[in-house]
């Protein structure tokens, strides 16, 4: 990280920042170039830390996950413009998380249902959600096992 003074290393603060984010962008690479997908997500801390996503069972994203599971990811929040006296002196406040990991499809039905409930809980923390096998079978659920994660902020 070039600006080490902006690094966030406190685990609890990183978890709060992740909780404040609404979108996780996952980046893939294939022979045609880079491909970035914005996704709804759940973050589950552990060893390893994990992100869960859901989506279609077919398409470019699903094909890339099967063929090239090494990915990068990015989340950001708390963006605010900092005005300056000239265009070159403008800046912004932000919090961001970036990292790398391996992504794959979840096939265990119980893990799929728990992942879907965790995704919903991220966006509706005051509600409880349960999914049937039939509902979970209709979508693909993907798990990203985090290999590296860094967090940065400018406040």
What would you call each of these model-derived segments?
Residues 2-5, 78-155:
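Charged, gly/pro-rich active-site loop segments
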Residues 21-57:
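Short beta-strand segments
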Residues 18, 64-65, 119:
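A generic structural signal for nonpolar/aromatic side chains embedded in well-ordered alpha-helices
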Residues 42-80:
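A short mixed-secondary-structure module that forms the rim of ligand-binding clefts
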Residues 28-30, 55, 75-77, 146-148:
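Short, structured patches in soluble enzyme cores that scaffold and shape functional sites
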Residues 8-10, 20-25, 125-127:
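Short Pro/Gly-enriched beta-strand edge/turn motifs at strand-loop
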């Amino acid at each position: 990280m070039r600006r080490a003074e902006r690094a966030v290393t406190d685990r609890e603060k990183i978890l709060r920042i992740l909780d404040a984010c609404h979108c996780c962008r996952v980046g893939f690479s294939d022979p045609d170039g880079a491909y970035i997908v914005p996704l709804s997500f759940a973050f589950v801390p552990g060893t390893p830390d994990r992100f869960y996503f859901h989506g279609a069972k077919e398409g470019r994203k699903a094909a890339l996950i099967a063929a090239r599971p090494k990915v990068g990811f990015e989340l950001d929040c708390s963006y605010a413009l900092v005005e300056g006296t000239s265009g070159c002196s403008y800046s912004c406040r932000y919090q961001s998380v970036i990292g790398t990991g391996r992504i794959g499809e979840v096939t265990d039905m119980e893990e799929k249902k728990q992942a879907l409930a965790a995704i919903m809980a991220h966006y509706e923390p005051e509600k409880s959600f349960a999914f049937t096998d039939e509902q979970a079978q209709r979508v693909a659920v993907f798990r990203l096992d985090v290999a590296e994660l860094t967090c940065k902020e400018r406040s």
